[in-house]
A protein has these predicted regions:
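Short, flexible turn/loop "capping" segments at secondary-structure junctions
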Residues: 6-7, 118-120
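Short acidic-aromatic low-complexity motifs
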Residues: 130-137
Length: 160
């Protein structure tokens, strides 16, 4: 994804740390696109896809006490993209993948601080809305989930 890796003058590659302004831009775009994907998924998600999302959520919940943040992050990624793929909008999913790649180095900073304050309530609300095929509620809860996480990262960037 564009901007995910930068070339240094000495030909080394580095992953750039995003500024607060860059994170705000990323937040606004991700909230819009991930909200759209979730809204669309609510009307199309199959029982098998929903079961997969619920299984991924159970893995996240089971990992919380262990403090294995890398594993949690992998399951969170699986859960989100299972939802986004249910939108049946592959071009949109590819856009979201690129945005996640751009944010990945900062996303590790969500652990453990932010994730200990967030007990998965927005994720649970999203899953419940998907189960009801309630597109508006699913979109709102996903937008809040993504927005809150990025707001936390913006706060960290502003404090530096």
């Amino acid at each position: 994804a564009e901007g995910a890796i930068e070339a240094e003058p000495n030909k080394w590659m580095r992953v750039p740390r995003l500024s607060a302004d860059e994170l705000r831009e990323l937040r606004d775009i991700r909230v819009a696109l991930e909200g759209l994907a979730t809204e669309r998924a609510a009307g199309l998600i199959t029982p098998a896809e929903l079961a997969e999302v619920k299984r991924f959520d159970a893995e996240i919940v089971a990992l919380r006490p262990s403090g294995d943040w890398k594993a949690m992050m992998a399951w969170i990624n699986r859960l989100h993209f299972a939802i986004y793929r249910a939108s049946r909008m592959p071009a949109l999913v590819r856009m979201i993948e690129g945005l996640w790649l751009r944010a990945a180095p900062q996303a590790t900073r969500l652990f453990p601080g932010y994730t200990q304050t967030q007990r998965g309530t927005l994720r649970t609300a999203t899953i419940r809305a998907l189960a009801r095929h309630d597109a508006a509620s699913a979109r709102r809860s996903m937008e809040a989930d993504v927005g809150n996480a990025l707001d936390y990262l913006i706060g960290l960037a502003e404090a530096e």
